[in-house]
Amino acid sequence: MPVITEIEDLRRIYKRRVPKMFYDYAESGSWTEQTFRENSSDFDKLYFRQRVAVDMDNRSTRSTMIGRDVAMPVALAPVGLTGMQCADGEIKAARAAEKFGVPFTLSTMSICSIEDVAENTTAPFWFQVYTLKDDDFMQRLFDRARAAQCSAIVITVDLQVLGQRHKDLKNGLSAPPKLTPASIANMMTKVRWGLGMLGTKRRFFGNIVGHAEGVEDPSSLSTWTAQAFDPSLDWDRIRQFKKMWGGPLIIKGIIEPEDAIQALNVGADAIIVSNHGGRQLDGALSSVRALPAILDAVGDKIEVHLDSGIRSGQDALKAVAMGAKGTYIGRAFTYGLGAMGEEGVTRALEVIHKEMEISMAFCGHTDINTVDRSILHIPKGFSGDWET
């Protein structure tokens, strides 16, 4: 069994074990990948202030996210195609999150369906939805989430149109994967992955096929996907979705203060400062650089979370210190899942937790809820001094 001490250990194993198209799907951004890179590198510009001769006993990372008790302020982000990284991937990730005591967020574009995950877990999970044109299908998604006892809906608002992701286009990404000479040759080298896929019936988008109008089988999925997303989305429509759902609402994809205020005004319970992991608008601010201005705009009137770029417990701790009430990991848990299945997700969470807990103690705190900006050296102009 390999010794796992950091998320990078899992990424290296993951790269060896999954087909290239699915590795590239996770480990890439849009256009030049500037934002994808800066999501991580901007965390490196924040430095910790180490304190000594401080009692470090009885450390706790326990906190809450939208009223839910969590073992640490970290949730598993919604990641599409998770069940292509590892057979029954969403179920395995949800189980690992439940056992660890952190929220799991299921993507609409998951391979395992809402019902699949609900049948294989006991803790309520969160369900992410995109803004789609078909109101009837949206209502049925909300109804299915309610029936599965999902405790919150996460609406992604930054995918009205799809970002230009060069690697996905060149790889012909799909679920199940398109069979070309190159993809077949590559998949034949991924024996563990292939055996897992042969042993499951879940190989298509489980929330879509057989549920969306005109998508009775996988052959019609590509046509539906090309037409389903709503480019005319506005805040009134988001307000309508909140009414259709009727429960706790998290809005994901906020990167500018004006939109944070709009999310507050439509009644969201929380927002996620996110640029979709650098997979939508390349050249946008990293999430951690965008965070201070958003916090200045909304204060404590709404819970502010952050995703994009978190690859360690130190990154998550820095985000919390900057003012985020919660954080999300997507790629970090995906590496673990593709590398070692459910155990790999658990390993990823253990790594994140240990890094967060020890770093917090070095900074003079034993309770995550007391952490603030005072534990950081923040460079002048970090959040930007822009003309507009």
Describe the predicted segments one by one.
Residues V70-M109:
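Glycine-rich active-site/cofactor-binding loop and its immediate structural neighborhood
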Residues Y47, R62-T64, P73-A77, P103-S107, ...:
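Short, conserved beta-strand segments within well-ordered enzyme catalytic domains
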Residues L81, R95, N120, D136-L306, ...:
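Alpha/beta enzyme core
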Residues K99-N120, P124-M138:
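A gly/proline- and charged-residue-enriched helix-loop-helix capping module
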Residues A75-L81, P124-Y130, S222-W224:
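Short, basic, glycine/proline-bearing loop/turn elements
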